[in-house]
């Protein structure tokens, strides 16, 4: 369970933003979407490799 303590005098929107950020980092929504339909291991591996290549290209272009 995610706990976000609200500091004294802190805006509720700021606390909500911190909660959303923590929730996003847990990856719960991403995992739920991935589990909606079965993905073959070969397809998952291919996607992972394509993402790695893409990220590498971005990194090289940045330099």
Swiss-Prot record:
Disulfides per UniProt: none
Q: Which InterPro entries match?
A: Ribosomal_bS21, Ribosomal_bS21_CS, Ribosomal_bS21_sf
Q: Which GO terms describe its cellular component?
A: ribonucleoprotein complex; ribosome
Work out whether the entry's keyword set contains S-adenosyl-L-methionine.
no
What are the GO BP annotations of this UniProt entry?
translation
Q: List the GO molecular function terms.
A: structural constituent of ribosome
The UniProt keyword set, sorted, is: Ribonucleoprotein, Ribosomal protein
Q: Which family does it belong to?
A: Belongs to the bacterial ribosomal protein bS21 family.
What's the protein called, per UniProt? Small ribosomal subunit protein bS21
Give the species this sequence originates from.
Porphyromonas gingivalis (strain ATCC 33277 / DSM 20709 / CIP 103683 / JCM 12257 / NCTC 11834 / 2561)
Q: What's the name of its gene? A: rpsU
């Amino acid at each position: 369970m995610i706990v976000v303590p609200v500091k004294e005098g802190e805006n509720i929107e700021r606390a909500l933003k911190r909660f959303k950020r923590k929730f996003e980092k847990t990856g719960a929504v991403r995992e739920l979407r991935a589990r909606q339909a079965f993905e073959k291991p070969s397809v998952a591996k291919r996607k992972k490799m394509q993402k790695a290549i893409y990220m590498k290209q971005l990194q090289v272009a940045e330099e």
